[in-house]
């Protein structure tokens, strides 16, 4: 029971730390379900299905694999995502990964600084 309580406290602290770092950077932050799969979602119908069925606020292709490996190895992890497109028919044209990545790096660094200080 003590281990579970410590894990929940750590999880809460990690989430709050990430949110605080994003807020300090003036970046909108949302917490919620992120759907993950093995393909780039560029289809409004599929996007709507994921949102309606799983209440997903986003979808991606990498975080689920990392989380699964961490779970198998009994290693705790958190996934922090930056949204780069709208996961619809215009996704390929609206993808702006480089700009999103550049905006995200300082937030991740600040979150780590806050978490470990």
Question: What are these regions, as identified by a protein language model?
Answer:
Residues 1-2, 14-117:
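Glycine-rich phosphate- or other oxyanion-binding loops that anchor nucleotides, phosphorylated ligands
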């Amino acid at each position: 029971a003590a281990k579970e309580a410590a894990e929940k406290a750590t999880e809460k602290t990690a989430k709050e730390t990430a949110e605080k770092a994003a807020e300090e950077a003036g970046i909108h932050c949302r917490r919620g379900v992120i759907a993950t799969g093995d393909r780039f979602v560029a289809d409004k119908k599929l996007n709507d299905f994921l949102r309606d069925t799983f209440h997903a606020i986003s979808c991606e292709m990498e975080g689920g694999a990392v989380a699964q490996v961490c779970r198998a190895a009994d290693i705790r992890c958190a996934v922090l995502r930056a949204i780069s497109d709208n996961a619809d028919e215009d996704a390929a044209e609206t993808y702006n990964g480089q700009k999103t990545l550049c905006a995200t790096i300082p937030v991740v660094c600040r979150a780590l600084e806050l978490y470990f200080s």
